[in-house]
Amino acid sequence: MEIIKVGLAAYGMSGQVFHAPFISTNPHFELCKIVERSKELSKERYPDATIVRSFEELIKDPAIELIVVNTPDSTHYEYARLALEAGK
């Protein structure tokens, strides 16, 4: 099985506690990009992941195969739709 290149849509509490640790410890996934609008909190724990500043920047990356939409609930539909339309 090939490794799936993953982008994480946010690095708030759920990204830090649940999503990034799961992705980074699962041998089938590679955490490649993380959206952090202003900070760079993920850099210490995930130095190989690239920090991007927007969701739009994340979905435009052709290398990203899967996007974890862990943003506030009110944005889930729109971000999931955009990710699916981008083939993620």
What are these regions (language model features)?
Residues 1-46:
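N-terminal Rossmann-like dinucleotide-binding module
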Residues 49-88:
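Beta-loop-alpha module in the N-terminal Rossmann-like domain of NAD(P)-dependent dehydrogenases
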